[in-house]
């Protein structure tokens, strides 16, 4: 029977060769790594396969490759409510557990890596017709991957970054990345899968594949290196992002409240380090997204709106470079974090004079240390927002224009002290549908509840770091958003916003993102990106601050930048950079409407 099975196997291979039109060449079995025998019968594990070929590679082909990998690993996954960010499936049947990623270098050398769809973890690879497994490989991996080809000697290291770095004799911060380094890594893995060169090569491969799929910021760095045919060395922000992916995922998933609304308020801070070695204490989703462009979440807990997978629990996942072991398929616990609320012009929501009497107004005031008692608020699961003074943020009534005060939580009018925090920055009273508003652009302004017109004066960020986030905004064809205003001149003469080649130190490409949803010129923060109207095809320009709806923007997780007042997105007109025109447009999902933030390190 084994002879018969072998003959059948040969026939299948011949059929595959003929079907693909391969003539006169030897078959490389790693092109068919899922062929296996069970008993006397041949089996085909139908794992999907994708390819990235460095020959003729462009940033566009790399972008498409990463997008396809994301699509495969998130099939059947749920998304976080109100976002487009998928959560990887906690468990999947073995028949869908892996994806093969074929990497081809300039010499035609092929290395195939196996990626676990539950973690984006590289778990094995094949090179030179041999399959290689890490020293901590599981039975599931050894049983299902690279069967039908010889097994190389077991690797002396695990797939964890700590083990790889030890074997490589170098840490990630000293190992360059880029197309030339990926080309070399494929060659090294092809020639020798077991030595220190292999460990170093795997560090390159893992970051340029798995980490780029997890974070659009890393994808963007690789894309730019391909476009420029250059290399880059991971900075401290990239490395801490890689280390904290699990913790990020946990905090995002625990930001869905008991009503299934994604507030984006973290229970615990995620600490990152920027490239100037300054600490970033990230305690809300908006800041996390702007700094990391997080694209995929690891399953950490079941959110209120997630479906529960009833398959048997998967084996514990030990993540690359992390000190966390994910154990439980448990429901997310929603905390009651205490944070500042900042909004118009970056000012903080403040209890006037720090007095705790019922009816005392709530205002906006400059944020300051030592003012925690009157500028910090606890977000309770019952929908109340409570001052450290012990009283609730309460609307005086349910009519447009009523003022907002602190009041005893138990004796306030029913529903007047309930609030819904939305990921777009709106804080709404669910009874009246009115939203928290700072009506005037001056400190000491008393807050009101008003009809939602999606104005900047109605946008808030919940988080203790109230400083604007300074960033470049990268758009179509890897070019940067730029304004052609000149300092110390009449700004009305220099109002155009357009795309140009990214230049690191060009001031006109630096933008400050404020808590009120405004995008401001970093060198003159009185100037805002403004929609010159509310209709499709209206231009986007620079104007002085007004607090209007046409000056508020939302960076969506799908890569669009939305003006919520017009319900239109930022668009490169006609996908033609040479027109030097950015406009409002209905969302189409096309590349000329996709944007990335590349945040800049803070000065010490």
From Swiss-Prot:
<feature type="active site">
    <location>
        <position position="211"/>
    </location>
</feature>
<feature type="repeat" description="1-alpha">
    <location>
        <begin position="345"/>
        <end position="387"/>
    </location>
</feature>
<protein>
    <recommendedName>
        <fullName>Ribosome-inactivating protein PMRIPm</fullName>
        <ecNumber>3.2.2.22</ecNumber>
    </recommendedName>
</protein>
<feature type="disulfide bond">
    <location>
        <begin position="348"/>
        <end position="367"/>
    </location>
</feature>
<feature type="disulfide bond">
    <location>
        <begin position="480"/>
        <end position="502"/>
    </location>
</feature>
<keyword id="KW-0677">Repeat</keyword>
<keyword id="KW-0800">Toxin</keyword>
<dbReference type="InterPro" id="IPR000772">
    <property type="entry name" value="Ricin_B_lectin"/>
</dbReference>
<feature type="repeat" description="1-gamma">
    <location>
        <begin position="432"/>
        <end position="465"/>
    </location>
</feature>
<dbReference type="InterPro" id="IPR017989">
    <property type="entry name" value="Ribosome_inactivat_1/2"/>
</dbReference>
<dbReference type="InterPro" id="IPR036041">
    <property type="entry name" value="Ribosome-inact_prot_sf"/>
</dbReference>
<keyword id="KW-0325">Glycoprotein</keyword>
<keyword id="KW-0611">Plant defense</keyword>
<keyword id="KW-0378">Hydrolase</keyword>
<dbReference type="GO" id="GO:0030598">
    <property type="term" value="F:rRNA N-glycosylase activity"/>
</dbReference>
<feature type="disulfide bond" description="Interchain (between A and B chains)">
    <location>
        <begin position="301"/>
        <end position="332"/>
    </location>
</feature>
<feature type="glycosylation site" description="N-linked (GlcNAc...) asparagine">
    <location>
        <position position="490"/>
    </location>
</feature>
<dbReference type="InterPro" id="IPR016139">
    <property type="entry name" value="Ribosome_inactivat_prot_sub2"/>
</dbReference>
<dbReference type="InterPro" id="IPR017988">
    <property type="entry name" value="Ribosome_inactivat_prot_CS"/>
</dbReference>
<dbReference type="Pfam" id="PF00652">
    <property type="entry name" value="Ricin_B_lectin"/>
</dbReference>
<feature type="disulfide bond">
    <location>
        <begin position="392"/>
        <end position="409"/>
    </location>
</feature>
<comment type="similarity">
    <text>Belongs to the ribosome-inactivating protein family. Type 2 RIP subfamily.</text>
</comment>
<keyword id="KW-0732">Signal</keyword>
<feature type="domain" description="Ricin B-type lectin 2">
    <location>
        <begin position="466"/>
        <end position="598"/>
    </location>
</feature>
<dbReference type="GO" id="GO:0090729">
    <property type="term" value="F:toxin activity"/>
</dbReference>
<comment type="subunit">
    <text>Disulfide-linked dimer of A and B chains.</text>
</comment>
<keyword id="KW-0652">Protein synthesis inhibitor</keyword>
<feature type="repeat" description="2-beta">
    <location>
        <begin position="525"/>
        <end position="563"/>
    </location>
</feature>
<feature type="repeat" description="1-beta">
    <location>
        <begin position="389"/>
        <end position="429"/>
    </location>
</feature>
<feature type="signal peptide">
    <location>
        <begin position="1"/>
        <end position="43"/>
    </location>
</feature>
<keyword id="KW-0430">Lectin</keyword>
<feature type="repeat" description="2-gamma">
    <location>
        <begin position="566"/>
        <end position="599"/>
    </location>
</feature>
<dbReference type="InterPro" id="IPR035992">
    <property type="entry name" value="Ricin_B-like_lectins"/>
</dbReference>
<dbReference type="GO" id="GO:0017148">
    <property type="term" value="P:negative regulation of translation"/>
</dbReference>
<keyword id="KW-1015">Disulfide bond</keyword>
<dbReference type="Pfam" id="PF00161">
    <property type="entry name" value="RIP"/>
</dbReference>
<dbReference type="GO" id="GO:0030246">
    <property type="term" value="F:carbohydrate binding"/>
</dbReference>
<feature type="domain" description="Ricin B-type lectin 1">
    <location>
        <begin position="335"/>
        <end position="463"/>
    </location>
</feature>
<comment type="function">
    <text>Gal/GalNAc-specific agglutinin. Behaves as a type-2 ribosome-inactivating protein. Inhibits mammalian ribosomes. The A chain is responsible for inhibiting protein synthesis through the catalytic inactivation of 60S ribosomal subunits by removing adenine from position 4,324 of 28S rRNA. The B chain binds to cell receptors and probably facilitates the entry into the cell of the A chain; B chains are also responsible for cell agglutination (lectin activity). Involved in plant defense against insects. Has very low cytotoxic activity against the human tumor cell line Molt4, but higher against CEM.</text>
</comment>
<feature type="repeat" description="2-alpha">
    <location>
        <begin position="477"/>
        <end position="521"/>
    </location>
</feature>
<dbReference type="GO" id="GO:0006952">
    <property type="term" value="P:defense response"/>
</dbReference>
<dbReference type="InterPro" id="IPR001574">
    <property type="entry name" value="Ribosome_inactivat_prot"/>
</dbReference>
């Amino acid at each position: 029977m084994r002879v018969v099975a072998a003959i059948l196997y040969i026939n299948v291979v011949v059929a595959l060769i003929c079907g693909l039109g391969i003539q006169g060449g030897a078959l490389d079995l790693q092109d068919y790594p899922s062929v296996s025998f069970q008993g006397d019968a041949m089996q085909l594990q139908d794992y999907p396969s994708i390819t990235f070929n460095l020959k003729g590679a462009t940033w566009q082909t790399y972008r498409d490759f990463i997008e396809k990998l994301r699509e495969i690993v998130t099939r059947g996954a749920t998304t976080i409510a109100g976002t487009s960010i998928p959560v990887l499936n906690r468990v999947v049947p073995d028949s869908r557990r892996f994806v093969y990623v074929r990497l081809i270098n300039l010499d035609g050398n092929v290395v195939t890596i196996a990626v676990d769809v539950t973690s984006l973890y590289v778990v094995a690879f094949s090179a030179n017709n041999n399959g290689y497994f890490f020293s901590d490989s599981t039975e599931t991996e050894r049983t299902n991957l690279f069967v039908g080809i010889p097994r190389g000697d077991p690797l002396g290291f695990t797939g964890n970054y700590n083990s790889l770095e030890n074997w490589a004799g170098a840490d990630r911060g000293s190992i360059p990345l880029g197309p030339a380094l990926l080309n070399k890594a494929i060659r090294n893995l092809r020639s020798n899968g077991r030595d220190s060169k292999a460990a170093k090569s795997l560090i390159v491969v893992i970051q340029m594949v798995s980490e780029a799929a997890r974070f659009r910021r890393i994808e963007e760095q690789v894309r730019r290196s391909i476009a420029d045919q250059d290399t880059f060395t991971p900075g401290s922000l990239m490395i801490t992002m890689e280390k904290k992916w699990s913790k990020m995922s946990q905090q995002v998933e625990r930001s869905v409240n008991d009503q299934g609304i994604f507030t984006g308020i973290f229970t615990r801070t995620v600490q990152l380090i920027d490239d100037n070695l300054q600490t970033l204490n990230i305690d809300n989703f908006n800041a996390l997204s702007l700094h990391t462009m997080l694209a995929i979440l690891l399953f950490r807990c079941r959110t209120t709106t997630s479906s529960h997978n009833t398959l048997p629990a998967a084996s514990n996942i030990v993540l690359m470079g992390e000190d966390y072991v994910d154990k439980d398929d448990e429901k997310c616990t929603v905390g009651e974090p205490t944070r500042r609320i900042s909004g118009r012009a970056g000012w903080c929501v403040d209890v006037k004079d720090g007095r705790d009497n019922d009816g005392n107004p709530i205002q906006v005031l400059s944020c300051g240390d030592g003012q925690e008692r009157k500028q910090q608020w606890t977000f309770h699961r019952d929908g109340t927002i409570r001052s450290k003074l012990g009283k609730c943020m309460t609307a005086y009534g349910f009519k447009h224009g009523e003022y907002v005060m602190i009041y005893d939580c138990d004796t306030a009018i029913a529903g007047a002290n309930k609030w819904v925090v939305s990921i777009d920055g709106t804080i709404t009273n669910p009874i009246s549908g009115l939203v928290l508003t700072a009506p005037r652009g001056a400190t000491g302004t008393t807050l009101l509840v008003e009809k939602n017109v999606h104005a900047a004066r109605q946008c808030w960020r919940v988080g203790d770091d109230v400083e604007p986030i300074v960033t470049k905004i990268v758009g179509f064809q890897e070019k940067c958003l730029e304004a052609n205003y000149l300092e110390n001149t009449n700004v009305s003469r220099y109002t155009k916003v357009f795309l140009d080649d990214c230049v690191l130190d060009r001031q006109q490409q630096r933008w400050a993102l404020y808590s009120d949803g405004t995008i401001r010129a970093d060198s003159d923060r009185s100037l805002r990106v403004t929609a010159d109207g509310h209709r499709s095809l209206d231009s986007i320009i620079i104007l002085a601050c007004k607090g209007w709806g046409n000056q508020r923007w939302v960076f969506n997780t799908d890569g669009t930048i939305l003006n919520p007042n017009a319900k239109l997105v930022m668009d490169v007109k006609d996908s033609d950079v040479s027109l030097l025109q950015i406009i409002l447009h209905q969302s189409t999902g096309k590349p000329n409407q996709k944007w990335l933030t590349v945040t800049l390190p803070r000065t010490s």
